[in-house]
């Protein structure tokens, strides 16, 4: 992974994506900035939403300074745009229907990191021809391919 070039005072634009073969199934996550900086990873059994949150978390952990996250995940973007997380915390991490919030472990870490960073969230339509969104989708899928098949 190369380090992104940062412009002081300007947010670093980071694209994130998660992918899953089956749901649950093997999954991958990725983040990338325009240029060469990116990171990706995979888990043997996970969900697409978990990988989307994981991608955003890894991006925020990896970039110093203000960050602009661009994601095709309504789940991730709306959590911050609509401040779902505030309701989750106030309700003891219970969501709709008084059910426990899924992926709480990742959400808690991501929320903590966004409190330490200046993060802006943007939604991009998936598979719409956005070059960077297509790039992180390909990186997330390539990460899945690195998993050893079960014998």
Residue ranges and their predicted role:
Residues 80, 149-151:
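Extended, charge-rich low-complexity interaction segments
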Residues 44-47, 98-103, 151:
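Short C-terminal domain-edge/linker segments immediately following a structured domain
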Residues 1-50, 54, 58-66, 141-148:
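RNase H-like nuclease fold core
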Residues 13-26, 58-135, 139, 144:
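RNase H catalytic domain
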């Amino acid at each position: 992974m190369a380090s992104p070039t940062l412009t002081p005072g300007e947010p670093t634009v980071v694209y994130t994506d998660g992918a899953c073969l089956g749901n649950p199934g093997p999954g991958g996550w990725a983040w990338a900035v325009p240029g060469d900086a990116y990171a990706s990873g995979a888990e043997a059994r996970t969900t697409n939403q978990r990988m989307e949150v994981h991608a955003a978390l890894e991006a925020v952990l990896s970039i110093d300074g203000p960050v602009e996250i661009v994601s095709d995940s309504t789940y991730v973007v709306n959590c911050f745009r609509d401040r779902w997380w505030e309701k989750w915390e106030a309700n003891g991490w219970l969501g709709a229907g008084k059910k426990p919030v899924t992926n709480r472990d990742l959400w808690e870490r991501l929320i903590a990191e966004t409190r330490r960073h200046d993060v802006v969230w943007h939604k991009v339509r998936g598979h719409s021809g956005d070059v960077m969104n297509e790039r992180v989708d390909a990186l997330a899928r390539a990460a899945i391919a690195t998993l050893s098949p079960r014998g």
